[in-house]
Amino acid sequence: MSQSARKILVTNALPYANGPIHIGHMLGYIQADIWVRFQKLRGNECHFVCADDAHGTPIMLKAQQLGITPEQMIGDMQRSHESDFSDFLVGFDHYYSTHSDENRELAETIYTRLDKAGHIKTKVIEQLYDPQKEMFLPDRFVKGECPDCGAEDQYGDNCDVCGATYAPTDLKNPKSVVSGAEPELRESEHYFFDLPAFGDMLKSWTRSGSLQNEMANKLNEWFEQGLQRWDISRDAPYFGFKIPGTENKYFYVWLDAPIGYMSSFKNYCSTTGKADWDTYWQADSEAELYHFIGKDIIYFHSLFWPAMLKGADFRQPTNVWAHGFITVNGTKMSKSKGTFIKARTYLEHLDPEYLRYYFAAKLTSRIDDLDLNLTDFAQRVNSDLVGKVINIASRCAGFIQKKFDGRLSSNVADSALLEDFQLAGDNIAELYEKREFSRAMRDIMALADRANQYIADKEPWQLIKQEGSEQEVHEICSLGINLFRVLMVYLAPVVPKLTEEVQSFLNDNFTWDSHKTALTDHPIDKFKALMQRVEMDDVNAMIDASKEEQASQTPAVEANDELKKEPIADEISFDDFAKVDLRVARIANAEHVEGADKLLKLTLDLGGETRQVFAGIKSAYDPEALKGQLTVMVANLAPRKMRFGLSEGMVLAAGPGKDEIYILNPHDGAKPGMRIM
């Protein structure tokens, strides 16, 4: 490279150590891995680290349920995660755990520095307490009736039915999820990080180019509402690190989790000697630091994390890059539909490079959700990788092997065409750098089309029949192999295993600059099939296996189980029922609600007027999949003002929640506005 090598540290969001990796998780890890492989191919000094997020109440309780220690559980889970990442060709330079000596030391260092600088405050708060388990209950470990709409079996932070948010202490008739006991209200002293003290610094940093514009704009809401002090402590019993100077207080998992980036890299530096930790983390560091994360953890990484680092006199990230979620066939990943696919289940049926390429073909630098349409997935991989790229080598290699002793020609048949392919490298490199992988794949496949068209026009299989045509055929097919080689250099960050096989076939080793050269008078090996086509039978077998996994994990349902869980309500008169005006409505539009975890905003067409309704169905439906559907709404429900806007009715749905919510659909013959009697 003409410029000096950059020093780069890349991290991925830490997977939580209480469950397996699924293909939704893999999106972010594949995105980061492609970017890292590109940087290394360019000759940059790029280090790629990650770790398991191994602390918190959920891990403590799950280990108790399994009858093992938390240490044993997180150890088993780490091995499982590392195996999945390795088999998906995610090439971490180091993978560690937040339950480590390095992480404890760094967490204590950061806390102590913040405390000495006056950024740690204490406050007595009221919390729900389980008297049987003798533990304070986090919001997701208490359930009760929603204080707004009265819906039963709702968690302690928000309602799945009406979308209301509240404190656990606001629940009616609360019960501990851990023991079923009625919790008590008790006081406890907690430790808080003074986030408001960093308001000016964060406003400047979030607009410095370190975040995507969508992220920076979203964070304005927090600044407008006013930053609040952040509770960084949890009461014993808790699986984590004890706060220095306390007897029964522990660091909240989200305090020591991002410090895991630092501790994983610290262990990597000390065990391998391949990098100097201070060079990448001290306040005056000139190295580049990038975090790849999901959009659901933006706040922790773009507010709390940079403020903690600033207050403890460490450097801030160069960029925090968020990605969206995945849907499968247009809807949320669903266990019942078999589209909640574990990474290991995928690997047992399909080549990981299929998914790596498909994700790359759809990923952009924006925070957009990505749909894994399984039919399109098979068609695109078969068309692009097998039908276009590999087909070039398949069409040319046989002639080289059989007619020319496996040696490429000394001359280039069409230097202008080869130069066009080579000149495309700068633009493709820029697209990789900017994480515009989708555009890069389109450009590469456009080149592949040109290469195939060149071979089709030259028809070497016909030309070879003509006497004296051997040299021309040799040069045509040799150019085809060189065009294929350039394409594989460009694809190397996406399909590393295929690239290794191609390098072996070509007797070559790639760097990014390999695209600027050609192989002439060069031996190649006999061509072997480099990739099999995606078979829909294998895709369907994967879906069936996912369904079977879900069935094996779900207890058998007794007859009338739904009625047992929620008995039929008290009898009402016909006059009472007649007061409820149920109408057929067409979903004219559906969209996400900024800041809402459960809600979608629906625009409902009643055949003469439109209504805006907020529905707690986000966990089960992709907005695009809802548009145009008929549904049923309560049309005369009094409008309800929510913090996201006015909700002018309610749509009807059934199901226990999460991905199992089913909106009611009238027969296609029904028309918007019709009353249901």
From Swiss-Prot:
Q: Which Pfam families match?
A: Anticodon_3, tRNA-synt_1g, tRNA_bind
The chain positions of domain tRNA-binding read 576-677
What keywords are assigned to this protein?
A: Aminoacyl-tRNA synthetase, ATP-binding, Cytoplasm, Ligase, Metal-binding, Nucleotide-binding, Protein biosynthesis, RNA-binding, tRNA-binding, Zinc
Q: Does the keyword Glycoprotein apply?
A: no
GO CC annotation terms, alphabetical: cytosol
Listed binding positions for Zn(2+) are C146, C149, C159, C162
Residues annotated to bind ATP: K335
Catalytic activity from the UniProt record: tRNA(Met) + L-methionine + ATP = L-methionyl-tRNA(Met) + AMP + diphosphate
Subcellular location, record wording = Cytoplasm
Question: What domain of life is recorded for the organism?
Answer: Bacteria
The record's EC number reads 6.1.1.10
Q: Where is this motif: 'HIGH' region?
A: 15-25
Q: Does the keyword DNA-binding apply?
A: no
Q: What molecular function terms (GO) are annotated for this protein?
A: ATP binding; metal ion binding; methionine-tRNA ligase activity; tRNA binding
Copy out the cofactor comment.
Answer: Binds 1 zinc ion per subunit.
Which PROSITE patterns does the record cross-reference, listed alphabetically? AA_TRNA_LIGASE_I, TRBD
Top enzyme class of this protein? ligase
Span(s) of short sequence motif 'KMSKS' region:
332-336
List cofactor names only. Answer: Zn(2+)
Gene Ontology BP terms: methionyl-tRNA aminoacylation
Q: Which Gene3D superfamilies match?
A: HUPs, Isoleucyl-tRNA Synthetase, Domain 1, Methionyl-tRNA synthetase, Zn-domain, Nucleic acid-binding proteins
How this chain assembles, per its entry, is:
Homodimer.
Q: NCBIfam families annotated for this entry?
A: metG, metG_C_term, PRK00133.1
Query: Which family would the database say this protein is a member of?
Result: Belongs to the class-I aminoacyl-tRNA synthetase family. MetG type 1 subfamily.
State its role.
Answer: Is required not only for elongation of protein synthesis but also for the initiation of all mRNA translation through initiator tRNA(fMet) aminoacylation.
- The molecule here is called Methionine--tRNA ligase
Q: What is the lineage of its organism?
A: Bacteria, Pseudomonadati, Pseudomonadota, Gammaproteobacteria, Alteromonadales
